[in-house]
Amino acid sequence: DSSESRGLGDVYKRQVAWGYARQADDMGVDIIQHCEVTGFDVVNGKIKGIRTSRGDIKAKKVGLCVAGSTNILAEKLNMTLPIETHVLQACVSEPVKPLLDGVVTFGAGHFYISQSDKGEMVMGGDLDGYNSYAQRGNLPTIQHVLTGGLALFPFLSRLKMLRTWGGIMDMSMDGSPIIDKTHIEGLYLNCGWCYGGFKSTPVSGWTFAHTIAQDQVHELNSELRLNRFSTGHLLDEKGLGTKTWIG
């Protein structure tokens, strides 16, 4: 029924983040920008606070939710996680008149496209395929992604690309996230969302808040625990992880 898809579209991610930040600020949450975490204070297996570039912050509970930087901070806690960090690129074209009012995805070709409110065609797809913390990628991946785009929309060949950029993704080994407690009392983990975490922001935040406040996982994230990688109870997500078992 075509009526079921009416009203669907894309969301400007920065505006969503700003909306959450504004509401959090109104509720008394301190948001400290340009503040790098440099270490953690752990005493007798309990978290006592964090060390930052702008001073120490004492806390009985700490939530680690830093996407592609997860392994960097985990190493400071002597934790080894089943996470790999990869670069994911995107690009935008010169603006054109409105022609797409939603998002089109090409699963087999690993390509997606939408149109911004300024008229640019926003496109992306595959990971760069190697481990990196650099927030930039290589041209061959963009060429590969746009080849898939041309298969869907040949007119794209006549457009100029304005810019490309990259972000670092925390890729779990089975393609599913981790929302759980850790072996350190008071330290909680939310990571492994790969390249699809934005759309899950509301439920991710809600279940993570419950896990921190109650010191126990919620029913909704009970299967997203860290120990599934040691027990073998991995989640079947169509091989959306990093595919490290493929030679």
Kindly give the residue locations of the regions a language model identified.
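A conserved short coil-to-beta-strand element within the FAD-binding core of flavoproteins
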Residues: Q33-K46
